[in-house]
A protein has these predicted regions:
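N-terminal interaction/assembly modules
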Residues: 1-96, 147
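Amphipathic alpha-helical interface surfaces
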Residues: 78-82, 101, 133
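Mid-sequence acidic-hydrophobic segments that form the walls
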Residues: 85, 108-111, 140, 144
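Helix-turn-helix DNA-binding module
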Residues: 111-128
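DNA major-groove recognition helices of helix-turn-helix
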Residues: 130-144
């Protein structure tokens, strides 16, 4: 279970890149089709035409719907669970120490041979405490992703 959670954590940068690309694609997409006309007072106005597949003619609403649909995808849910688990690391510690611990656990999970406890220099946290917190983080990821 922890090994599967470790692979999920190692895939986090790829999921985040994929998510950012999808959001950029949605936000950068062209607007909806519209018809422009002149009102009696000489003011110009637009009427947005309904899009294909039942989408609204409002470009902002269409983009919101697309982002909502994106948030319901499996890889985005997994990405969110891992982010929540990272935020939960070291909740009982002062902020600076908590950030150092989050960074250290992140690096250790990415490459445990290169970033061992001794090389990470996490002040105020002992070796056994570090690995206990790392295991708790991976268990949190596993639980959040439904591996148990």
């Amino acid at each position: 279970m922890l090994k599967a959670a470790l692979y999920i954590v190692r895939g986090q940068p790829r999921r985040e890149r994929r998510y950012r690309d999808a959001v950029e694609e949605i936000l950068g997409a062209g607007g909806a089709q519209y018809a422009e006309y002149t009102m009696r007072g000489g003011e110009k106005a637009r009427t947005y035409l309904p899009g294909a597949k039942g989408k609204t003619g409002n470009p902002t609403a269409s983009k919101v719907e697309a982002i909502d649909a994106l948030e319901r995808l499996g890889y985005v849910k997994t990405m969110r669970r891992v982010q929540e688990a990272y935020e939960a690391i070291g909740g009982d510690l002062p902020e600076k120490m908590r950030q150092d611990l989050q960074r250290a656990i992140s690096l250790n999970c990415a490459d445990g041979k290169r970033y061992t406890y001794e090389r990470l220099n996490v002040g105020g946290i002992g070796r056994s405490d570090f690995y206990t917190r790392r295991a708790a983080f991976l268990a949190d990821v596993a639980t959040g992703c439904g591996l148990e």
